[in-house]
Design a protein with these regions (language model features):
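Short beta-strand-loop/turn "lid" adjacent to the catalytic site in phosphate-handling enzymes
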Residues: 19, 25-31, 43-74, 101, ...
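Conserved ATP-utilizing enzyme core subdomain
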Residues: 120, 127, 131, 136-171
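Short glycine-rich, Thr/Ser-proximal phosphate-binding strand/loop in the N-terminal lobe
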Residues: 3-41, 109-117
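Glycine-rich phosphate-binding loop of actin/hexokinase-like ATP-binding domains
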Residues: 71-132, 229
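Glycine-rich phosphate-binding loops at beta-strand->alpha-helix junctions
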Residues: 57, 194, 199-222, 234
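Conserved phosphate-binding/catalytic loops in two-lobed NTP-binding clefts
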Residues: 69-73, 220-239
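Glycine-rich phosphate-binding/hydrolytic loop that grips phosphoryl groups
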Residues: 123-127, 230-249
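Adenine-nucleotide phosphate-binding core of ATP-dependent small-molecule kinases
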Residues: 161-195, 234
Length: 249
């Protein structure tokens, strides 16, 4: 039998299909202005016995499709535990929220903290800052690694930070140096979340921002040890949902 998990995120939708608890298919698309239409396209031709949804759009998905839902916290804990069984702390930074999750020795959630009230420290923040500097998201992390000076960014508010970036550019500061400062400000915020949930190694980094090489390098410095990133860090929630769909049916 095949089971599926779908993560309806603010920016992207991920689908994972399992057979005998092995990943047989991964699909991804943009959420767009109509995430349910996008989800329908993503599911076209996919065979499964049951599907479980997670992410911010999970309850809407449940209204349109025969499914059940699971919180992102639970889904990420299960997905990360499947990929790296020894993981004890998870950091997820997505398009519009970020979360830190502490697990016990059995992989159960014991504490978590979530920022979903503003864009500060999220993928949306980085996207806006990258645009302000004339970079796309892929360039933003790569170019920041080439910086020669670390510039302090005083505000994490997206509106004020964008204004600050504009001022720094007008003052003649190098774009790479500004990019490094912005990436570091995100890591500083994330490290604070990790510490508040009682940071314990090993640490697993998930979500779209985990593809940013500069963020990963700075996070390892902040944690003081290696962090683990899966080759497709955005599919962890969908994987967890698929595993739970199989477990509960």
């Amino acid at each position: 039998m095949q089971y599926a998990g779908i993560d309806i995120g603010s920016r992207t939708i991920e689908l994972v299909v399992l057979r005998k608890n092995e990943i047989i298919e991964i699909r991804q698309t943009d959420s767009s202005f109509d995430p349910m239409a996008q989800a329908k396209k993503l599911l076209k031709g996919v065979e499964y016995e049951y599907i479980m949804a997670t992410g911010y759009g999970r309850h809407l998905f449940e209204k349109f499709f025969d499914s059940s839902t699971i919180t992102e916290i639970k889904a990420y804990a299960v997905g990360a535990g499947y990929l790296f069984p020894k993981i004890r702390t998870i950091l997820d930074i997505g398009g519009q929220d970020s979360k830190a999750i502490a697990l016990n020795d059995h992989g159960k959630v014991i504490k978590f903290e979530m920022n979903d009230k503003c864009a500060a420290g999220t993928g949306k923040f980085l996207e806006i800052m990258a645009q302000a500097l004339g970079y796309n998201l892929d360039q933003f992390g790569i170019e920041a690694l080439k910086a020669t000076k670390d510039i302090q960014i005083s505000s994490m508010c997206t509106v004020f930070a964008e204004s600050e970036v504009t001022s720094l550019v007008a003052m003649g500061e190098n774009r790479r140096d500004i990019a490094l400062g912005l990436n570091r400000s995100v890591v500083k915020r994330a490290a604070g979340m990790l510490k508040r949930v009682s940071l314990k190694e090993p640490v697993f980094f998930a979500g779209g921002v985990a593809r940013n090489q500069c963020i990963c390098a700075l996070l390892e410095q902040a944690v003081g040890n290696e962090i683990f990133v899966y080759e497709n860090p955005q599919m962890v929630g969908a994987l967890g949902a698929a595993l739970l769909a199989a477990e509960n049916n």
